[in-house]
């Protein structure tokens, strides 16, 4: 994909240059852009013509928020485009992905790979290690029954590696693990912030 999107959280975008960084950006942020690495779309309100992104460095502490001009985007990759990219490493997160792939596909869900695994699969840049979790997203435009969420969580918990799945709903995202749990309200994250809701698919709660 290329052009002006629309881009969604967890999409990876290429085209940002060091010249687009603020003057106080750390040296490592300049280095990753000079190396041609992508940035990841994050949830935040922006002015028209911009998208909120995050840069990632070598260590977990190296994360930097920035704004990217949409016209600078050369191409982008969605998490669901990475489900069947052949893994190139021995890491448990990639082994878990191979274990889960067929079962998730069989449900005819729209799902994808995000986080460190998605970054490595999309860019070829080493981002995983022995103790990395596997981050997944699931597009859920309609209500996912909580009983079904519990079944899905049980599947993920049997993958042999910690798996963190986010449900992408029309008004934001929430953790599958929370929705599968007993709490009456769960944390819904949106571009305008986070709030506790009882029904993440209810537009009235999203706007409250």
Swiss-Prot record:
Pfam families: MdcG, MdcG_N
Keywords: Nucleotidyltransferase, Transferase
UniProt-annotated catalytic positions: 133, 135
InterPro entries: Holo-ACP_synthase (IPR017557), MdcG_C (IPR049180), MdcG_N (IPR048903)
Leader peptide range in chain numbering: none
Reaction equations catalysed: apo-[malonate decarboxylase ACP] + 2'-(5''-triphospho-alpha-D-ribosyl)-3'-dephospho-CoA = holo-[malonate decarboxylase ACP] + diphosphate
Catalytic EC class: transferase
Enzyme Commission (EC) number: 2.7.7.66
Molecular-function GO terms, alphabetical: nucleotidyltransferase activity
Family affiliation: Belongs to the MdcG family.
Functional description taken from the UniProt entry: Transfers 2'-(5-triphosphoribosyl)-3'-dephosphocoenzyme-A to the apo-[acyl-carrier-protein] of the malonate decarboxylase to yield holo-[acyl-carrier-protein].
HAMAP family in the record: Malonate_MdcG (MF_00650)
Protein's UniProt name: Phosphoribosyl-dephospho-CoA transferase
């Amino acid at each position: 994909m290329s052009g002006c999107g629309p881009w969604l959280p967890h999409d990876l975008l290429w085209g940002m240059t060091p010249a687009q960084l603020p003057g106080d950006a750390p040296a490592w942020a300049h280095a990753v852009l000079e190396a041609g690495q992508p940035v990841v779309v994050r949830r935040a309100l922006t002015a028209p013509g911009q998208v909120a992104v995050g840069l990632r460095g070598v260590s977990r502490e190296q994360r930097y928020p920035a704004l990217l001009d949409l016209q600078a985007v050369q191409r982008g990759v969605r998490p669901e485009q990475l489900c069947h990219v052949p893994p190139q490493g021995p890491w448990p997160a990639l082994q878990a992905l191979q274990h889960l792939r067929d079962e998730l596909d069989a449900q005819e869900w729209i799902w994808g790979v995000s986080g460190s695994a998605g970054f490595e699969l999309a860019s070829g840049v080493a981002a995983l290690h022995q103790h990395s979790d596997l981050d997944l997203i699931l597009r859920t435009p309609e209500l996912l029954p909580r009983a079904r969420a519990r079944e899905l969580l049980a599947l993920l918990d049997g993958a042999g590696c910690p798996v963190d799945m986010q449900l992408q709903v029309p008004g934001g995202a929430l953790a599958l693990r929370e929705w599968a749990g007993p709490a009456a309200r769960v944390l819904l994250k949106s571009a305008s912030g986070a709030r506790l809701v009882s029904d993440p698919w209810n537009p009235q709660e999203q706007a409250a």
